[in-house]
Structures are given as C-alpha cells and as structure tokens.
Amino acid sequence: MIERVWQLVSVAVMGAGSWGTTLAKVFADAGNTVQLWARRESLAETIRTSRENPDYLPGITLPDSVIVTSDAQAALDGCSIVVLGIPSQALRTTLVEWRDLISPDATLVSLAKGIEKDTHLRMSQVIAEVTGADPSRIAVLSGPNLAREIAEGQPAATVIACEDENRAKLVQAAVAAPYFRPYTNTDVIGTELGGACKNVIALACGIAHGFGLGENSNASLITRGLAEIARLGEAMGADPRTFAGLAGMGDLVATCSSPLSRNRTFGDRLGRGESLEQAREATHGQVAEGVISSQSIHDLAVGLGVEMPITQAVYAVCHQGMAVREMVDALMGRSKKAE
C-alpha cells in the first residue's frame, strides 16, 4: 500500500508525447485527477474517444480520470502540480504562452532532459527565468524511466529533485503508484545534468553498437561516460552522490542499453553509416535529444575546463562530420592515465 502524506491533488501534464502520456497514467493510477494537454486537437480528440494515444503510446489504455484537452488554459486552471513534458529546446517559447495561466503557488515539474542551446541553462533555470517562479517551486523528475515499460505497469523507480524538500515530498506522494516508486533529493543540478548528459553517452553507445562493437565497448562507454558526467557535475556544484543513484547511473544504464531508448537507437543508425538526415527521416522526423545536447554540453564543458572526451567525440560526429572510425580511434588513442 502506498503511504500518503498529502491529500490527492489536481495535476496538469502538459505534453502528450510518450513520456507525458505515461506520467498522466501514473498520476491517475496513483488516485489523482489529471488534465493531459495535447498540442493538436485532433490527437486530443482521438485520445478522448479511444482512451489511447496511437501516435506515441499505442496499445496502452488511459484511465477515465485522465481528462484530455488541447486548451492550455483549461488544463492549467487550478492545478497544484504542473508537469512540463515539452522538449528542452521548445520549453522557453512554450512557457512564454503559459506563464500567466499557471497558479502562483503551483509546483512545476520538469521532465525535459537537456541543456538549452546558446544559453547553456538547465531546464529548471529556463523555467525560473521565463515564469518568474522561485527555484524552490521547481522540481525535476528523472531516472531510469523508459516510458513504455512504465505504461505497461512494469516496476520502476525515479527521483524527484527540488530545493524545497517538502515540495519534493508532495510530488512524491502524488506520483507514487504500485509500480512506480519515487525517491526524493534536493540536488536539482546533479539530477538535471545526469538526465541531460546520459543522452549523449547513449548516442555514443548506439554508435558503437551500430558500428559492430560489443559489450566490452558498451560497458566502457557507460562507466567512462559516468566519470565525465560526474566531473561536469562537480564543476557545477552538484552532489557527487547523485551520479551513483537513479538519476545518474540508473538512467545512464537504461538509456544506453535498451532498444526502447530513442538516443541509443538514433546512434545505432549513425554507427551503421546513416547521415543525421537519414536517421531523422527513419525516426519520423524526430532528432534525438542527445544530438542537440551534445553541442550544449560540449560548449559548457569547454567553458568550465572540464574534460569530456566521449561528449567531445559525439559532438564531432554529429556536428563536425567526424567519421565513426575516427571517433573510435580518437577515444582509444588518447594519452594513457590512471582511472
């Protein structure tokens, strides 16, 4: 039985992609009434009538307590928890449209795993800047959370990070379902960096797999990838312990190893010799988050003087035209050093 500290709350999940739709189901299964916002009215109508999201989560039936709308004002009205399921590079412009519709004391929960291009801001910083919300009102949900597995009710755990521990506990209580176990912490920086950087490492693992490399290579990329994520985190003031937890190693392993991972799958196509454009076409026009984040994180690391060789290699493949063979040689030919 799930322990509850607060009463059930009203939740708005803004974004009907695979993860947003899944979390709407989780919040509903936890006993809450949920507003799920879809950008396209045609998709909202389809979900309302069929109780299924055929575009992003086919085969999963949503509870009747998930109310679907394409009207942002209706979705946000009076909700005490607002879950932002918007891609990282679209978050700023979308929030400009919504900021006056959000309740002044609502807890804002970010799902986006990325670093904003050009500004190099984390998503919680973008939310605070655009909405004017105090950082203590902004939480981050991150962990080894492959959407379809969770939507199917397979057991999983996640992290709710917020500067205000009580707000983190409020979200924890609201999203805890029999198959979904949330933990809390107050390290927003580390939680966000783990989520953003793992997409880049997952691209590297996918590239290696597509190139024909085996499990030794995959394990090496994951462990050395974690090391460089932790170095960046330390330089930015994160708690090093975060990277050994669900938002660090947990998310990294799931994303780097599963064929359900969009970033790993995208990288696999690059490793097999497809161009970025070919890989994009094969994934219905979607660019993996790690492709964009590789540039932001690379620039961030250079600015802070942090060594991130795997990120540098992925950046070179995605943005500078480096061949995969060159990427492998560059990583293996680096100067020798202690672990």
UniProtKB/Swiss-Prot annotation:
Domain of life of the native organism: Bacteria
Any single GO BP term: phospholipid biosynthetic process
This protein's pathway: Membrane lipid metabolism; glycerophospholipid metabolism
Entry EC no(s): 1.1.1.94
Key words of the record: Cytoplasm, Lipid biosynthesis, Lipid metabolism, NAD, NADP, Nucleotide-binding, Oxidoreductase, Phospholipid biosynthesis, Phospholipid metabolism
GO cellular component: cytosol
Catalysis performed (reactions): sn-glycerol 3-phosphate + NAD(+) = dihydroxyacetone phosphate + NADH + H(+); sn-glycerol 3-phosphate + NADP(+) = dihydroxyacetone phosphate + NADPH + H(+)
A GO MF term: glycerol-3-phosphate dehydrogenase [NAD(P)+] activity
InterPro entries, per database record: 6-PGluconate_DH-like_C_sf (IPR008927), 6PGD_dom2 (IPR013328), G3P_DH_NAD-dep (IPR006168), G3P_DH_NAD-dep_C (IPR006109), G3P_DH_NAD-dep_N (IPR011128), NAD(P)-bd_dom_sf (IPR036291)
Record-annotated disulphide pairs: none
Residue positions binding NADPH: 18-19, 39-40, 113, 147, 262, 287, 289
Main location per the UniProt record: cytoplasm
Entries under PROSITE patterns matching the protein: NAD_G3PDH (PS00957)
Positions with a binding annotation for sn-glycerol 3-phosphate: 113, 143, 198, 251, 261-263
Active site as annotated: 198 (proton acceptor)
Location(s), subcellular: Cytoplasm
UniProt cross-references to Pfam families, sorted A to Z: NAD_Gly3P_dh_C, NAD_Gly3P_dh_N
Family named by the database record: Belongs to the NAD-dependent glycerol-3-phosphate dehydrogenase family.
PANTHER family: GLYCEROL-3-PHOSPHATE DEHYDROGENASE, GLYCEROL-3-PHOSPHATE DEHYDROGENASE [NAD(+)] 2, CHLOROPLASTIC
Function noted in UniProt: Catalyzes the reduction of the glycolytic intermediate dihydroxyacetone phosphate (DHAP) to sn-glycerol 3-phosphate (G3P), the key precursor for phospholipid synthesis.
Protein name (Swiss-Prot/TrEMBL): Glycerol-3-phosphate dehydrogenase [NAD(P)+]
Species of the source: Corynebacterium efficiens (strain DSM 44549 / YS-314 / AJ 12310 / JCM 11189 / NBRC 100395)
Gene name of this polypeptide: gpsA
